[in-house]
Amino acid sequence: MTQYLDFEKPLAEIEGKAEELRALARANEEMDVAEEAAALDAKAAKLLDELYRDLTPWRKCQVARHPERPHCRDYVDALFTEYTPLAGDRNFADDLAVMGGLARFNDRPVMVIGHEKGSDTKSRIAHNFGMARPEGYRKAVRLIEMAGRFGLPVVTLVDTAGAYPGKGAEERGQSEAIARSTEMCLRAGVPLVSVIIGEGGSGGAVAFATANRVAMLEHSIYSVISPEGCASILWKNAEKMREAAEALRLTAQDLLKLGVVDRVIPEPRGGAHRDKTAAMEAVRGAIAAMLKELDGKSAEALIKDRRKKFLDIGSKGLAA
């Protein structure tokens, strides 16, 4: 059953009526509701286009967080073959908020790493809602180092509200672990490409997205802080999240103009959660294109390219 966001309530009513008609027809074979159902479907499609044509930043936040949106596990299953998971940071524990391992992408060996939020209550708790602890970032460092030894490109899939801010995480060196992961991304001598598939929250996202090429799905977000957190700090009122979302310029379209990301991946009508297969195939195309752009570059050129990319952030688009 589709979960509707608050701004999709009119759409829910129309699609609900269409489904009721079809249910009646299934119960009574003599009923012919094809024409009425088709009319409702057309009306719903038109409304869906109108709703998603010009989403506000806050509505994009809602879409990026949609519980039915495809997660890292879905992308790995759909886009990669021969996936062999690698666990643990060889220091403390295995953080299930971060998944990663060896795989093939379009028959090319790669290292894939990403945040996994989970898909139901039990798995979300197990994966800590995609909020990594220090051992998760240290696992990523280990896997990127391994990729460097074997000359494997690294693909990262970012989807996190941010690094976990718990007491234990802080005691085990959360900020240092994030910094080490970012440093490892900057000095890896192999191609590194990143896709923000949902939420890109603060340093927890940057630690995986310090890449040669960064792409964002059309309705994903990437920001130094959540709109709710920003509103609580600036206005002492989390209800100001809409204003905060506008000010943060966290949408893929804004960040492309600012030079923070390199490309925006179009999503199916109504968001990635409405057609997961199409969304994941669009991501496949973007990853393939980004890897192709980096083919043939030396380790020195890749490192120089990556460092320049991030040193240049803030040099354009701010006056717009």
From Swiss-Prot:
For this protein, what reaction is catalysed?
Answer: N(6)-carboxybiotinyl-L-lysyl-[protein] + acetyl-CoA = N(6)-biotinyl-L-lysyl-[protein] + malonyl-CoA
Where does the CoA carboxyltransferase C-terminal domain lie? 39-293
This chain's function reads: Component of the acetyl coenzyme A carboxylase (ACC) complex. First, biotin carboxylase catalyzes the carboxylation of biotin on its carrier protein (BCCP) and then the CO(2) group is transferred by the carboxyltransferase to acetyl-CoA to form malonyl-CoA.
Supply the alphabetized keyword list.
Answer: ATP-binding, Cytoplasm, Fatty acid biosynthesis, Fatty acid metabolism, Lipid biosynthesis, Lipid metabolism, Nucleotide-binding, Transferase
Tell me what this protein is called. Answer: Acetyl-coenzyme A carboxylase carboxyl transferase subunit alpha
Q: Per the similarity annotation, which family is this?
A: Belongs to the AccA family.
Q: Which organism is it from?
A: Ruegeria pomeroyi (strain ATCC 700808 / DSM 15171 / DSS-3) (Silicibacter pomeroyi)
| Quaternary structure annotation from Swiss-Prot or TrEMBL | Acetyl-CoA carboxylase is a heterohexamer composed of biotin carboxyl carrier protein (AccB), biotin carboxylase (AccC) and two subunits each of ACCase subunit alpha (AccA) and ACCase subunit beta (AccD).
The membrane spanning regions, by residue number, are: none
The UniProt entry lists the main location of this chain as: cytoplasm
Encoding gene per record: accA
Q: Which GO terms describe its biological process?
A: fatty acid biosynthetic process; malonyl-CoA biosynthetic process
Task: Identify the domain of life.
Answer: Bacteria
Q: Name one GO molecular function term.
A: acetyl-CoA carboxylase activity
